[in-house]
């Protein structure tokens, strides 16, 4: 594979190669939301279902729509390779409250929280319309807030506050507590990035 956008394509190529050696039975034993029919895995991401061929990676959207961007495809590969079912205890956590959160908080803040604040906090009506289009669950927190089923049993909330003359817009992203055990810190960053990008694509 000729790598042009190294930041996105090199990680994808790496995990696509690891994916070739994946044991499908081991995946479905770890992840109850994933189906395997002998040729393809089927799984959902933010309300859309995708089929991923194995061992030679190929992805298709079951709704016939656009394929997810490469970072989302890499996230799906890492999910199949590394994640597992973890029961949600009903609590919500910030990124900082989870393992390694303190170490990654600076890049996370810029890549997720600041981006969400200035992308959505200045356009609340469009943000609400996009989230409702994605059939997200409205929250009573923030000036606007919604809950999403990301993948499997993992859920996320995004809360946005509109800016004014005194304060800039603000945002917070909350994760269902099972993220702490089910995903590495870098994957939690990517999950936030994917959520923001997907909402933005609907605005």
Protein language model features and the residues they cover:
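Conserved binding-pocket/active-site segment within a compact domain
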Residues: 121-181
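Domain-length accessory/inserted modules outside core catalytic folds
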Residues: 50, 104-112, 116, 141-142, ...
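Short Lys/Arg-enriched alpha/beta "domain-start" segment
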Residues: 1-39, 72, 79-134
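Short amphipathic C-terminal alpha-helix that caps PH/PH-like domains
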Residues: 76, 80, 192-195
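Amphipathic, interaction-prone secondary-structure segments
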Residues: 27-55, 137-162
């Amino acid at each position: 594979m000729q790598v042009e956008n190294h930041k996105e394509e090199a990680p994808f190529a790496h995990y696509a190669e690891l994916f070739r050696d994946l044991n499908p039975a081991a995946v479905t034993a770890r992840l109850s939301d994933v189906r395997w029919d002998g040729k393809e895995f089927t799984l959902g991401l933010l309300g859309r279902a995708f089929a991923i061929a194995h061992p030679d990676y190929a992805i298709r959207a079951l709704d016939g729509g656009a394929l997810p961007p490469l970072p989302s495809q890499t996230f799906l590969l890492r999910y199949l390779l590394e994640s597992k079912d973890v029961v949600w205890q009903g609590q919500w956590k910030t990124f900082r409250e989870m393992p390694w959160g303190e170490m990654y908080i600076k890049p996370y803040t810029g890549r997720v929280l600041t981006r969400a604040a200035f992308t959505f906090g200045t356009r609340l009506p469009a943000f609400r319309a996009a989230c409702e289009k994605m059939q997200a669950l409205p929250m009573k927190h923030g000036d606007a807030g919604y809950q999403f089923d990301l993948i499997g049993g993992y859920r996320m909330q995004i809360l946005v506050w509109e800016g004014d003359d005194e304060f800039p817009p603000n945002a917070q992203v909350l994760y269902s507590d099972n993220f702490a055990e089910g995903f590495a810190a870098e994957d939690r960053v990517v999950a936030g990035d994917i959520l923001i990008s997907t909402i933005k694509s609907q605005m």
